[in-house]
Design a protein with these regions (language model features):
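P-loop NTP-binding catalytic core
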Residues: 1-18, 24
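P-loop NTPase catalytic core
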Residues: 16, 24-27, 31-263
Length: 263
């Protein structure tokens, strides 16, 4: 998680999108985020929301996170679309109520793509059909879900980190991604070439980032991170990640790494 904390840190109230081609490690990444948050911020209530996932993936999440305190809520792909929608809306409603009670809540959900597909399949009458065969109305609830992330002025927060599936061969999946691209204040792109070479985390660092990161770093840390990005810019994702991982191994913490970087 050290790389993520540098490249695209997460703050309370964040709305983050993880852009994931197949087999790039998104499942493990979501599990690692949950574990890291619960280890370092025990006050946060973590909910893993799995929509239309394989039953074995749901079981893996529950077993992996069994002793962490994370709550796994799922509607696997052997359930009807109506069940996917019911679980999604119940989870969001409960998380919003908790945030209003001044609690900090994190929803990690997989995926925006399958959530939107579920709403598209449940529409009883057809509206305007977009390219890829998706009804424009299918985005209404997924947009509201993703947009619910915020830090409340009187205390409490709802952080939402969701995945969007790309490079699946489906035109509909690509349209769904394009609809949500740029709507978050954090985007993390996973890179297939890195995953194929078994280099993890498989982040495309130049395409990933957090908006208003100055709220999450000190002025000196931010300056060092900008220097780091400039040093890595122009390099291919594999080369950039290998270089960063090699440097991180030399220091025990990110604070120590940034202090040593750039003099």
């Amino acid at each position: 998680m050290r790389v993520m904390d540098i490249i695209c840190p997460i703050g309370k109230g964040q709305r983050g999108l993880i852009v994931a081609p197949p087999r790039t490690g998104k499942t493990v990444l979501l599990q690692q985020i949950a574990k890291a948050v619960l280890t370092n911020h025990a006050e946060v209530h973590v909910i893993i929301l799995l929509v239309d996932e394989r039953p074995e993936e749901v079981t893996d999440f529950r077993m992996t996170l069994a002793k962490t305190g994370a709550e796994v809520v799922a509607s696997s792909n052997d359930n009807p679309y109506a069940r996917h929608i019911e679980v999604t809306e119940q989870t969001l409603d409960r998380a919003k109520r908790m945030a209003e009670q001044k609690k900090d809540v994190l929803i990690l959900f997989d995926s925006l793509t399958r959530m939107t597909r579920a709403y598209n399949n449940q529409l009883t009458s057809r509206g305007r059909t977009m390219s890829g065969g998706i009804d424009s109305r299918a985005f209404q609830m997924p947009r509201a879900f993703f947009g619910a992330a915020r830090a409340l002025e009187e205390g409490g927060s709802l952080t939402i980190i969701g995945t969007a599936l790309v490079d699946t061969g489906s035109r509909m999946d690509q349209i769904i991604f394009e609809e949500f691209k740029g709507t978050g204040n954090m985007e993390l792109y996973l890179e297939r070439e890195l995953a194929d070479r078994r280099i993890f985390p498989s982040f495309d660092m130049m395409r990933s980032g957090t908006r208003r990161e100055e709220l999450l770093f000190t002025a000196d840390e931010l300056k060092k991170i900008h220097l780091l990005r400039r040093a890595l810019s122009g390099r291919k994702p594999v080369e950039a990640m290998e270089m960063l991982l090699d440097r991180l191994k030399l220091t025990p913490t990110n604070a120590a790494f940034l202090k040593s970087f750039g003099g």
